[in-house]
Amino acid sequence: QGVSSAASDLYKRQVHRRMGGQLEIAVFDKTASNPQARIAEAIARFARHAPEVALSVHVASISAIERGIIDGRFHVGVIPTHRNSQSLAYADLFGETMLLYCGRQHALFGQPHDALSWERLRDYPFAGLAHHSPNMELSHRANLTRKATGSDEEAIALLILSGQFLGFLPDHYASRFEQQGQMQAIAPERFHYTCRFVSVLRKSPQPTRATQLFQDCLMAVHPDAIR
């Protein structure tokens, strides 16, 4: 144990001495409120190991994050899984549950939902994300009646709150609207889907030491990830 501790201390000293510059991290919308996401813990861990590295955190869409990783603007990304790019390396981190919601002024609010089916949902205007994502894949697969699009989940929430549209949101994000009586989950045991979130790195050139260290921190704080 003494040898292991000494080796760990030596590693930390080397990291502190040699690692500097800036690390650009990009994450998908509304991850901070997800109890399964421990990105803040990864940031804390990284900051302890590499205090001289300046951190810059961005929130962006899946496609913008992947493009940014490929062109070198971002070093590490965290996104929901969708379709993989051959230029990128992905590693599983955590999950998220998406439920279907309506706003307080919607016809389905406060009504029984037992008779609702995916087919019946097509009678109601749907608001979905504008970019390729698990949200878009599901709405196409279920043939929902898309009448509005949002660039991110904040936009979807506004559309749902209008009372004119149904839409999917992360359960952890929508819970505060539910508690305030502004939204209702519609038959959550039936109308839901789950998605996995992954870290994203560029395959070539090889990640910088700071990038690899942050990736290691992400993996360390998500022990339940699918390996």
Question: Where are the predicted features?
Answer:
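Short, well-ordered beta-strand segments
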Residues: 22-29, 77, 127, 167, ...
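Periplasmic-binding protein-like
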Residues: 190-204
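Short helices/loops that flank or line small-molecule/ion binding pockets
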Residues: 58, 63-74, 153-164
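Short beta-strand-centered segments that line the small-molecule binding cleft or hinge
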Residues: 42-45, 63-98
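N-terminal winged-helix
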Residues: 18-49
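Single conserved hydrophobic/aromatic residue that forms the stacking wall/gate
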Residues: 1-7, 11
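C-terminal regulatory
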Residues: 90-164, 169-192, 212, 219-227
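Residues at or immediately flanking beta-strands
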Residues: 22-24, 50-56, 196
